[in-house]
């Protein structure tokens, strides 16, 4: 009985960990695609870069202040 229970617990832990890791990897891949799209869109604006924190094109001096005004969403 203990062996069956142990196999079940191991199977559950491995499956659960795999699902969690898959979700984390999906978030990372999706975020990288968003950042890449934002960077491509910002190339068309003069003196602008993509702010990774909020995915907006910001004038270079405002880049790290989250574009309080004038930020253009991707």
Curated annotation (Swiss-Prot):
PTM: Contains 3 disulfide bonds.
Keywords from the UniProt entry: Disulfide bond, Secreted, Signal, Toxin
Coiled coil stretches, renumbered: none
Organism domain of life: Eukaryota
Subcellular location: Secreted
Tissue expression per record: Expressed by the venom gland.
GO MF: toxin activity
Signal peptide: 1-26
Family: Belongs to the scoloptoxin-10 family.
Protein name: U-scoloptoxin(10)-Cw3a
Organism of origin: Cormocephalus westwoodi (Westwood's green centipede)
